[in-house]
């Protein structure tokens, strides 16, 4: 598909690679489309669509002393026209010429890497399709069947919607919200009749990423990302509650169900109770758990841990890999093929960092347990930082699941019913790091903190500022519920794909009373 800019994303990749004069080159072309809907005071207010295009060129100069002796220059530009492609390549090459040797330098991934869907065959020059050797969708030698998404290294060939390298970039449009909007309209009218006000937004994006390298890799991934956030207020605007959901296509969003849950919380808040700061047994819903554990995940880098700079550093040197963090049999994991949370199954790195590397572009990703049955099992690493830390290579993956292996984990409603006295949170926000050595975080509760006594919610209490370490919290888990898909409220702009349980934490530190509402 040729766009208004003149070339398809695939052609842009090929022309940039053809124009390159550096020893190696990596090109990433991304096309993103979006649709959104907003409402306030029970009235639809705006809707819109968007489209954007991004080109990243990574030029690599080799200095003749092996694959680890190289420098890299990176240039990213939006809306690049055909006549500007070569200029972007030259800018990247100039940046590489001026750069010092990169500490993460390495050889590029080759098309023979397992999982290189869309890789170029060096002998024939053809782009591998989903059923060819070295690609996802591998046939089972014994059964002849096609591997599905839930099997390692596979795309489902029976899903004809899975595009190949040569297929046009996928796009979203306002129609993805059509059925949702119809149900939303009914929900807004019901809220109006009941004397409640609903505010919120729904948005959907679809990004097609095309990755090509001078080593022959050609990989493509389409990533749908959607979310809805809904806020309910009483008619006098004194009571407020929030709910959110992440989605791939809005077919699984029950906006009426979300609104019903908010109505119940507004009713809980008709009675208010003042509580002082202190340590409380606390029920955290999945959204709050995801915000805390997402930050833990982002902080779980191998390089800085090996350097003694983080909570995952071992006193005296090394990392805490193998150390038990929780008495509960909990596992924190990522899997690019997790049902409902699928993400890119290969590394896409626009820049190098402590635990990411532009030299790793195209490396296949596989399911990784960061915490396994309560013990620290892996840290995020590039090939370089894994070598520094003396650990296996485990790059970051764009989803996160936290679950217990205990039998019959309860739903949040059952956890409330079995509670003697505890706080029940709605969500967290304004989360900031205080101390990386303990991963102490501070932040605020928002849109509803409730007191539970003898199995029932008895009223709403004031908001608090909290000071907690998610690592320390793991050691004080009393109960872990059933894992469900959720939306991190604080980090949902950056990290959308999560499945978390509600948890019961002993002594959650509400450090001060907050006047925030």
Which residues are covered by each model-predicted region?
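Active-site bordering "gate/hinge" segments
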Residues: 1-357, 372-373, 456, 493, ...
């Amino acid at each position: 598909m040729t766009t208004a800019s003149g070339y398809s994303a695939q052609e842009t990749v090929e022309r940039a690679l053809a124009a390159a004069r550096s020893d190696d080159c990596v090109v990433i072309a991304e096309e993103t489309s979006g649709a959104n809907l907003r409402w306030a005071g029970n009235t639809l207010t705006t809707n819109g669509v968007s489209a954007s295009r991004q080109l990243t060129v990574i030029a690599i100069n080799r200095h003749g002393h092996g694959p680890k002796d190289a420098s890299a220059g990176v240039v990213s530009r939006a809306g690049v026209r055909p006549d500007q492609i070569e200029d972007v390549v030259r800018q990247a090459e100039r940046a590489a010429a001026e750069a010092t040797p990169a500490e993460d330098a390495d050889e590029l991934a080759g098309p023979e890497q397992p999982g290189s869907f869309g890789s170029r065959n060096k002998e024939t020059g053809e782009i591998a399709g989903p059923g060819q050797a070295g690609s996802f969708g591998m046939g089972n030698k014994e059964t002849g069947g096609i591997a599905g998404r839930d099997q390692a290294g596979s795309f489902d060939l029976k899903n004809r919607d899975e595009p190949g390298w040569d297929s046009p970039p996928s796009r979203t449009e306002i129609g993805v919200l059509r059925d949702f909007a119809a149900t939303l309209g009914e929900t807004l009218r019901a809220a109006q009749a009941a004397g409640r006000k609903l505010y919120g937004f729904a948005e959907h994006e679809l990004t097609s990423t095309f990755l090509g390298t001078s080593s022959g890799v050609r990989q493509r991934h389409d990533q749908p990302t959607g979310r809805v956030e809904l806020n309910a207020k009483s008619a006098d605007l004194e009571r407020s509650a929030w709910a959110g959901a992440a989605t791939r296509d809005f077919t699984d969003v029950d906006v009426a169900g979300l609104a019903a849950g908010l109505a119940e919380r507004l009713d809980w808040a008709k009675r208010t109770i003042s509580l002082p700061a202190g340590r409380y047994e606390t029920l955290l819903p999945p959204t709050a758990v995801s915000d805390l554990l997402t930050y833990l995940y982002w902080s779980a880098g191998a390089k800085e841990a090996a350097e003694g700079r983080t909570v995952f550093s071992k006193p005296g040197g090394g990392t805490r890999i193998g150390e038990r963090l929780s008495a509960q049999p909990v596992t924190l994991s990522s899997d690019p093929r997790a049902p409902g949370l699928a993400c890119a199954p290969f590394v896409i790195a626009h820049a190098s960092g402590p635990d990411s590397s532009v030299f790793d572009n195209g490396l296949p990703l596989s399911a990784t347990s960061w915490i396994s049955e309560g013990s620290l099992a892996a840290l995020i690493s590039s090939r370089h930082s894994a070598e520094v830390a003396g650990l296996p290579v485990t790059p970051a993956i764009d989803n996160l699941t936290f679950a217990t292996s205990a039998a019959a984990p309860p739903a949040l409603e059952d956890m409330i019913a079995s509670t003697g006295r505890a706080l029940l949170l709605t969500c967290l926000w304004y989360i900031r790091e205080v101390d990386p050595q303990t991963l102490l975080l501070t932040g605020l509760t928002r849109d509803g903190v409730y007191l539970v006594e003898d199995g029932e919610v008895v009223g709403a209490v004031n908001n608090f500022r909290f000071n907690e370490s998610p690592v320390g919290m793991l050691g004080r888990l009393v109960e872990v519920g059933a894992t469900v898909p959720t939306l991190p409220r604080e980090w949902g702009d950056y990290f959308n794909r999560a499945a978390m349980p509600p948890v019961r934490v002993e002594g959650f530190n509400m450090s001060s009373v907050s006047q925030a509402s």
